[in-house]
């Protein structure tokens, strides 16, 4: 594996660990280029999908901190090729507040496929395919 690919995988693992730890602001922004975008494809929580720029990504991280008591990412598989990384992960998130029919402390579970494109060692584009288990 080329050193750039290995480095990008290390960055993604650190990024997911930062999300698990509740990183916001600069602690999260450091993983992204200033012109970064996140594309969230339609899913149970966001039926129309969403395109977010970096300020919106950071704002949503703060919202997530209020919504979730905890979250984790269990990487099932990962692959890097050039400036691209793809991961498959299982995600459980425990609610800090009620959400729809779910009570506080309920755990949601999802299966993610996330594709990243890098520029200069930072995430320029993130595409999420999030499949939530029924609740």
Where are these regions (language model features)?
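Generic anion/oxyanion-binding catalytic loop in active/binding sites
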Residues: 1, 17, 46
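Alpha-helical assembly-interface signal, strongest on the long, hydrophobic N-terminal helix that forms
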Residues: 16, 20-23
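Basic/polar N-terminal segments that are highly enriched at the extreme N-terminus
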Residues: 1-10
């Amino acid at each position: 594996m080329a050193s750039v690919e290995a480095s990008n995988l290390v960055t993604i693992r650190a990024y997911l660990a930062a999300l698990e730890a509740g990183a916001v602001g600069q602690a999260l922004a450091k993983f992204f280029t200033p012109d970064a975008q996140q594309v969230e494809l339609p899913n149970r929580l966001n039926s129309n999908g969403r395109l977010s720029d970096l300020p919106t990504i950071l704002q949503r991280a703060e919202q997530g901190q209020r919504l979730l008591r905890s979250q984790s990412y269990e990487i099932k598989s990962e692959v890097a090729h050039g400036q691209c990384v793809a991961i498959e992960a299982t995600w459980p998130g425990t609610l800090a507040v009620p959400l729809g029919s779910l009570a506080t402390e309920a755990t949601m579970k999802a299966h993610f496929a996330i594709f990243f494109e890098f520029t200069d060692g930072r995430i320029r584009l993130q595409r999420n395919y999030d499949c939530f288990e029924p609740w």
